[in-house]
């Protein structure tokens, strides 16, 4: 039998897509903050044309994670993971942490000019 979906994959996909969406702007700033320098840092904007695709993927993945976590729970058999209230509360907490990180990553390119 297959394991029931719990939203973990959608949370991971949303977080990864948000990181990729802000990689063109966040990457050079992180490298400069770590002490790296050079003209090659300007080439890290290669992902900029794909930013809208990554933003869309992040939002779609978060929607599916939200739907999987907050929709009415299916009947769980005793002893299954979905029957444990602490697990559901943990998934909700992780969802909101990832959602906040996605919003920070998506908004970072707009506040980045204030750091340079």
UniProtKB/Swiss-Prot annotation:
The chain crosses the membrane at residues 16-36, 46-66, 94-114. Keywords: Cell inner membrane, Cell membrane, Membrane, Mercuric resistance, Mercury, Metal-binding, Plasmid, Transmembrane, Transmembrane helix, Transport. Hg(2+) binds at residues 24-25, 76, 82. It is a multi-pass membrane protein. GO terms for cellular component: plasma membrane. It comes from the Bacteria. GO terms for molecular function: mercury ion transmembrane transporter activity; metal ion binding. It is found in: Cell inner membrane. Pfam families: MerT (PF02411). Involved in mercury resistance. Probably transfers a mercuric ion from the periplasmic Hg(2+)-binding protein MerP to the cytoplasmic mercuric reductase MerA. NCBIfam families: PRK13751.2 (NF010314). Belongs to the MerT family. This is Mercuric transport protein MerT. The gene is merT.
